[in-house]
Amino acid sequence: MREGSFPRRIGLLLGLLGLLAGVATFNIDTKNVVVHHMAGNYFGYSLDFYHEQKGMPVLVVGAPEAESNNPNLAGIRRPGAVYACSVNRATCREVHVDKMKGNLKKLNGSHLVPIEEKSHQFFGATVRSNDKHDKIVVCAPKYTYFYSKFEVIEPVGTCFYAENGFDNAEEFSSCKQEPARHGRHRLGYGQCGFSAAVPGKKNQNRVFIGAPGVWYWQGAMFSQNIKNQTDRPNTEYGSKEYDHDMMGYSTATGDFDGDGIDDIVAGVPRGNDLHGKLVLYTSKLKMMINLTDEVSTQHGQYCGGSVAVADVNKDGRDDIIMGCPFYTDYGSVKDAKTQERKPQYDVGKVIVMLQTAPGVFGKQIAVVGDDQWGRFGHAVAAAGDLNLDGYNDVIVGAPYAGKNKQGAVYVIHGSKDGVRELPTQKIEGANIGHGNIKSFGFSLTGNEDVDGNGMPDIAVGAWKSGNAAVLLTKPVVTVTGQTEPESALISVEDKNCDVDGKLGKQACKHINTCFKYEGKGDTPNDLEFDLRFNLDDHSPEPRAYFLQKDVKSDRSIKVAQGSKTRDHPSSIEQRVRLEKGRQKCFRHRFFASSTMKDKLSPIHWSVNYTYVESKTGKLRGDKLEPAIDTTVPLSFQNKINIANNCGKDDLCVPDLKVTAVADREKFLLGTQDNTMLINVTVQNGGEDSYETKLYFDVPQGFEYGGIESVGGDGSKSAPACSPTSDEPDSDGKWTFACDLGNPLPANKVVSSVVRVTASSDKPPLAPISINAHVNSSNDEEAHTVADNKVTFTIPVDFKNQLSLNGRSNPEQVDFSMTNKTRVDAFDDNEIGPVVSHLYQISNRGPSEVDSATLDIFWPSFSTEGGHLLYIITEPVVNPPNKGRCRVKQLQNVNPLNLRITNEHVPTEPPVAKTPNEYSREEDDESYEDETTTQSQSTRHQSTQHQTHHQSGPVHVYEKDEEKIRQNTGNWQYVEDKKKKGDYEYIPDDQEYDGDDFEEEDDEDFDRAGSKRVKRNPTPKKKKKGGEHRGEPRSDKARFSDLREAVKLSKEAGGVVDYKGPLSRASVDCNSLRCTHIECDIYDLKEDEFVLVEIFSRLYTNTLVDEKNPGGDISSLALARVTSTKYNLPHKPTLITAVSTNMNAIASEEGRDLPWWLYLLAILIGLAILILLILLLWRCGFFKRNRPPTEHAELRADRQPNAQYADSQSRYTSQDQYNQGRHGQML
């Protein structure tokens, strides 16, 4: 359900904005900062507050690379220095604590030589005072000592302790011990003073010194008695597994066993297998416990790099804050593009370890930094109670966080549960002073009220830019209040106030809001606040507005920036002045729009308050302005419900149910009907359903075509539907949302029909998933939501049933075994009768076929190489726009260049042209002959003949397959004398291939001048092992494959599915004595077909010469689908053979005619002759006078157009006379 999701998001956003505002500014003042600066000497490397004189604090700042002006250190190069700086103005002075003049010298033999070196000793690297800031220790961890034998120079380190000023400072070098305990395996590289802590309870006369370099850098803690130089016990040496742990890297004191005496906590950043840890010791250096990270430990995080002690939860027990500056956050940030977790390196973290009982730290709280490479936790310090809420707070330094990596300091407030998990304030170095501070937060200190306002202040060091800053804490103002409606409900039908002339009367109500504030610290008696009222702030579009005339009538009110409307604003601002401790109330009127859609969700509003700060950040009397307490709510919220028909409980619980069914069980691709209807029914069996929406997915490959809702009365209305996003989802689906009613009443049924249309460019190929669900803004019962969604799948199929049929015309041809036709034939009708094979390729549908191929293998030659079915024209295709054919062996079309008499063309076509006329541009280049080129006359003759047939009537044959389908026999044959009509083309023990025949050219020429080709076949016996000379490649079809295909068609009685080796590419008719006709068929829709007819003449002389007794001659056709719009498997190849039966008779006279036909023909001829004689006699034909014989002689040489008579009484023209044909000229 959608209710509540948007309000939760808005609430979360407002909370986040409030948090960010609190983080940016709370009560650490950043406008009036005292910034000290010294460049080039690491000024700010360490610092702490110290009461140099009673009641007069100063900020002691270390500069370990400084050139000291202490006269006792004259000639010492960069020994380092410590400065006492004012807390209220930018002035500092160097403090001289080293009273020894120069380096100490001792006799080495007879010479007095230095036994120590103070140059580059890093004096001021450690500055630490106690809790009361009346004792202080400053150290030089790189101080070197030569020992009594002057054999080594080792960095033992040294420290100076002072109280009540710096005049009586005393030096302690705990690692410098005689007799010689030098060397890295002892104390020589101890660097005593790397860290230090001064206890503050029960007058402990000790200082705790950290020495991380002793004993192969295992590290140690020294308890130095400030009254006795030699009273300096240290922690024990450990086994070698603790080498390089560097205990003493950081140090702090606190009571960890409940005895009231400060104990020691030492940081060990490389301990615990490089995870880091803390080690706790009593004041007498008795080990108590090890503390490790139990929240989110990882290698190299450097836990223990810093440490501080404070009671953060006000339970009277000291808690420990441990810094882990190199912690990497692997989980909180996602990549914007890939949404993968993106590691944030060196963000750092601090772990607050709460002491739940003496010596027991039972709870840990981790606070993680927010800036990569920032090293949050590099420095930590107890800050005191900054906001005066009774809980001590902590400050954390991240010297490389913030803008331009200039550093930042975070304020973490204590609480009864420990600390708040997020910082309350973030102070960036870029916002301090002139904005040029770098490494801000490298060193920290706090818990000292330097301005006397009763609130602790803090100081921050930044060694990289040479700065130390004192930041003051502002007094805190805590605001309380409430906002209430005048009644719990508002009815949009109760229009009780006139808004304006355009909107007329609307339903109006009042909001009552009251505020007051209290102060902590030195706060003024009255303050100005800005109030912001946001109406209906949980809704994306407001439904309630303040009245414009009310806004204009009050000068303290104005339209708020960012208000979603201006004429009648949804947000207003008002500036008010409040008196401390006194409540003040305000009344505002609003109206609810009568045209709102969401009548179920309450109208929420919020009132935010902010304090109006001055530019200087100070009040009259040079006092700091107060800060708003961000630990309490910064806004107040309430709501008013909208009256509805939900009963006394004011809660409507619908019971929605959706069902859906498609108008088909299977979706067929490529059909004319590419639209699918989805019938969706939504029923509400519960109470009113508000903002009821139907969501449905338009599957990939479909386009949305509209929706109609059919009511119970049969009327149709179109609900408003729109896509839920501008882009489809990752699966290519669009989701549409349709409004069904607001509300959809109880027991209402809405039936809808969704229309989707398959895309022509990218149709659906996978099963279609239909998803629909219904939703409303009011929640259902949990057990009724299962029927709010429906999902089902419709399979996708592609069916195009390709059919192939053929027939011969005529089905039988009679030929004489005794009479041969003329050898030198001139016309095509002189070589034999016409034989045509007609093939029909059809698409039964329902899906469309984009392209298909039809390959016809034509028996042009006999086994002896003679012409058999002599092709007289190129194939005829009807309709011509649906396909075209090409004769691959174009030399086999009318190879003798006979004159075509066109006897094969019917004079009266049985049916007129087809009703669909198409136009397709001819592409002659793609049909260019691949093998040979005919003479110009032959090409012209063939083209002229083809044009004649394709431009003539279209022959439409019956579609009845039973009439077209033919039984087929063998393609070509040899005689079997045992049984007539049972023939095979090749004996079982022979196989013919293209290379088994040799061609010889006959030099005789026909009358048209074309060369004749005579083929003399010489069949070869198969060699042993199945190999023979000229065997084709394995991917080429053999003649036996053609024979088997014809046999399959014959046994099946026509067309049959074929999975054999024959294909367009595998059959080479140049070697198999056939003619290959390639046809490409286009765009066959359901029930469309293409006819391909091949016209030939039976070359009877070949049958007579080869003494063929008769049988079947068959052509073979292969058809297959080659392309559709869909990537789906095609049907297998179809084959069929068309046969013409050859019937051999003894002679022409041998035809079995009835005797009475002969008698009748003689009598009719005699009667015609008698009638003709009588007619001529009556006309006097026999009585005419004949001229003399000599005058009848005709001289051909005198009359050029005369006829020549031959000895056989035949006449011919002079230019066509031939003695061999016409005989002797008379």
From Swiss-Prot:
Effect of disrupting the coding gene: Severe paralysis at the 1-fold stage of embryonic development followed by an arrest in elongation at 2-fold stage. Loss of myosin and actin organization in embryonic body wall muscles and loss of muscle cell polarization. RNAi-mediated knockdown in post-hatching animals causes paralysis associated with severe disorganization of body wall muscle actin filaments and defects in egg-laying associated with embryonic hatching within the mother (the bag of worms phenotype).
Compositionally biased region (Low complexity): 932-951
Residues of this chain annotated as glycosylated in UniProt: 108, 228, 290, 608, 679, 775, 819
Tissue spec. comment: Expressed in body-wall muscle cells, distal tip cells, and vulval tissue.
FG-GAP repeats: 27-94, 108-171, 178-233, 234-290, 291-345, 362-421, 425-488
Mutagenesis or variant effect for residue 441 to D: In st567; severe paralysis at embryonic 1-fold stage followed by an arrest in elongation at 2-fold stage. Loss of myosin and actin organization in embryonic muscles
GO biological process: cell adhesion mediated by integrin; cell-cell adhesion; integrin-mediated signaling pathway; mitochondrion organization; muscle cell cellular homeostasis; negative regulation of epidermal growth factor receptor signaling pathway; positive regulation of engulfment of apoptotic cell; positive regulation of locomotion
Keyword match Ribosomal protein: no
Keyword annotations: Cell adhesion, Glycoprotein, Integrin, Membrane, Receptor, Repeat, Signal, Transmembrane, Transmembrane helix
Start-end of Basic and acidic residues biased regions: 1027-1040
GO molecular function: integrin binding; transmembrane signaling receptor activity
Record topological domains on the Cytoplasmic side: 1178-1226
Bias (Polar residues): 1200-1226
SUPFAM superfamilies in the record: Integrin alpha N-terminal domain (SSF69318), Integrin domains (SSF69179)
Span of the annotated motif Cell attachment site: 620-622
Annotated localization: Membrane
GO cellular component: a single term: external side of plasma membrane
Positions with biased composition (Acidic residues): 920-931, 985-1005
Bias type Basic residues, positions: 1010-1026
Pfam families: FG-GAP (PF01839), Integrin_A_Ig_1 (PF08441), Integrin_A_Ig_2 (PF20805), Integrin_A_Ig_3 (PF20806), Integrin_alpha (PF00357)
Extracellular side: 26-1154
PANTHER family listed in its UniProt record: INTEGRIN ALPHA (PTHR23220), INTEGRIN ALPHA-PS2 (PTHR23220:SF133)
Function of the molecule: Required for muscle development probably through the regulation of the actin-myosin cytoskeleton. Component of an integrin containing attachment complex, which is required for muscle maintenance. During the formation of neuromuscular junctions at the larval stage, negatively regulates membrane protrusion from body wall muscles, probably through lamins such as epi-1, lam-2 and unc-52. Required for distal tip cell migration and dorsal pathfinding. Required for egg-laying. May play a role in cell motility and cell-cell interactions. Plays a role in vulval development.
Subunit structure and binding partners: Heterodimer of an alpha and a beta subunit. Interacts with beta subunit pat-3. Interacts with dep-1. Component of an integrin containing attachment complex, composed of at least pat-2, pat-3, pat-4, pat-6, unc-52, unc-97 and unc-112.
Protein name: Integrin alpha pat-2
Species of origin: Caenorhabditis elegans
